[in-house]
Amino acid sequence: MFKLFTARQHDKIWDFDGGIHPPEMKLQSSTVPMRIAPLPDQLIIPLQQHLGPEGELRVRAGEQVLKGQPLTVGRGRTVPVHAPTSGMITAIAPHTTAHPSGLAELCVHITPDGEDRWREQQPWADYRQRDKMALLDRIHQAGIAGLGGAGFPTASKLQGGLNGIITLIINAAECEPYITADDRLMQEHADEVITGIHILRHLLQPQQVLIGIEDNKPEAIAALQRALRGQDDIHLRVVPTKYPSGGAKQLTKILTGKEVPFGKHSSSIGVLMQNVGTVVAIKRAVIDDEPLIERVVTLTGDALSSPGNFWARIGTPVLYLLKLAGFKPQNPPMVIMGGPLMGFTLPSLDVPIVKISNCILAPAETEMGLSEPEQSCIRCGLCVDACPAGLLPQQLYWFSRGEEHEKARNHNLFDCIECGACAYVCPSNIPLVQYYRQEKAEIRALDQESARAAEAKARFEAKQARLAREKLARELRHKQAAVKLTDADQQTVDAAVSRLTRQSDGSESVINIPAGQMPDNSAVIAAREARKAQARARQAEKQQARSTEETTDIVDPRQAAVAAAIARVKAKKAAQVQHVTTDVAEAGSEAIAEDPRKAAVAAAIARVKAKKAAQVQHVTTDVAEAGSEAMAEDPRKAAVAAAIARVKAKKAAQAINPD
């Protein structure tokens, strides 16, 4: 009885609040075997196909590549992309990608050569001989991201779960209508699914491994049971069909009874989840050394004559796949990537298949129902009952329309999984998920702006602090420089301190002079005489330097010639003055001999002439001095001064001897 109770507890499943039961519409594609899509004429590989930044390019246009060759560098959370086949890189240019915005992203354009040649491969037959970090690096370099739709880098997710993981859950629910990619993958490749689970179990060492699958996939359930025969370490749990039971938080609640707290991931409660398609990709990367270059894509809808699931290379244009399934264009044209609840209408059919593209839905004109206009909310509360995350969709709608961002955030807008259950049950046809997506984008933009502003403020404050530190350091250096002593000053101070220390210690005795005796000042007198001798020597050196400079000043030949001319003029004038004085004296003597009165007159005239001669001599001396100064300044000025002196001397001579 106890064993039966334990078994029932072991297989127990729980339920989550909310959820809906839309038409499944899976039989169109789940009953048809998978097909391999041929290579298209051109492959378009976007550089970013995961959550995180795009990788750095490793190739150039015009380069030949091989199948499986990496096109970008994978570092950190950057997942590399690989060449899906061998061929020529014709261009590296922007192209419209699978996104609701329809914006162009950088892509690598490859023209296949038809040979499909692989790069060198290194399979690992026994992965258990490899350490965990080598396995994680292998998974990362294979470019594996979550194939269930989130696109989170798988290696990063696994590395975060190396410690503390209690339960490993394999998500095989595939709850959204129309999509059957995982269903067919489990039916045809159940052995690879189980092998991939063993690799994850070797990495994470969880206490239990659970596979959650909805009860509307009997063929897949049977295939997994056959693959698990004889293995009791992996438990298959069949859960009731209910949308969105494939959500990470919802499936965790169903299988473990635990709820993931608001704002956190399932790893916070010891649970790690991986999609079935991701598990197969891990097996092929680790054991077969095959990077993620293809995936299973469901092509379904009434606009297709041959729906089914295809192995499609990453980068295959959507229109090419639709033609393989017998696409019949509708009016108005509408092709959805993803399911009818969580998918989005493609802006163009030239967009390529990426790693998270699990379904291409091409409905007929009447298949999705007539489009009805949006009406006002009637506050019926059906959206609250349908929400599997336990949110208040009606309140979030009002906050989103009113741009009340903080209120929307506080009401846990980011816990919305965008499943579309609220919009599905809304009688007013309000596209609630679109409002939530737009509000999330606006809040993220505001957060980024706030982060940039905070970074700018932090940089400004850091700069101000640095400038303040530099100013203080500068002032300190100036203070230190102001009080810093030279070596000589320091020696003097040290000597004085030493003398004071010796005196205080008594080591230096004071000299006492007895009364009636004179102190011996011979040393002081000798020092004074030495200083005087040094002063006299310096004075003699200065005089010698001045005489040398004067001698050097007369070295110029032109200056010497001018000086000689001035000397001759002075000598000539002196001779003339002497001759005039002699004549006057003789005339006076003759006049005295003849008449005393005439003698007096002659004497007066002689005195006047002598006075004029003295004035002429004084002028000549001034002119000579001026000429000497001009000569010292400029040779040309000296010549002019000499000419002027000669003219003045001539006039003076004429004044003395008018006759």
UniProtKB/Swiss-Prot annotation:
Subcellular localization, per the record?
Cell inner membrane
Comment on bound cofactor: Binds 2 [4Fe-4S] clusters per subunit.
Gene3D superfamilies in the cross-refs: 3.30.70.20, NADH-ubiquinone oxidoreductase 51kDa subunit
Any one of the GO BP annotations: electron transport chain
Enzyme class, spelled out: translocase
Example GO CC term: the record gives:
plasma membrane
Give the protein name, as stated in the record.
Ion-translocating oxidoreductase complex subunit C
Q: Which residues form the 4Fe-4S ferredoxin-type domain?
A: 366-397, 407-436
Q: What is its main location?
A: membrane
What organism does the record attribute this protein to? Yersinia pseudotuberculosis serotype IB (strain PB1/+)
Q: Which GO terms describe its molecular function?
A: 4 iron, 4 sulfur cluster binding; electron transfer activity; metal ion binding
Going by the UniProt record, its keywords in alphabetical order are: 4Fe-4S, Cell inner membrane, Cell membrane, Electron transport, Iron, Iron-sulfur, Membrane, Metal-binding, Repeat, Translocase, Transport
Which family, according to UniProt?
Belongs to the 4Fe4S bacterial-type ferredoxin family. RnfC subfamily.
Query: What gene does this protein come from?
Result: rnfC
Give binding positions for [4Fe-4S] cluster 2: C387, C416, C419, C422
The cofactors named for this UniProt entry are: [4Fe-4S] cluster
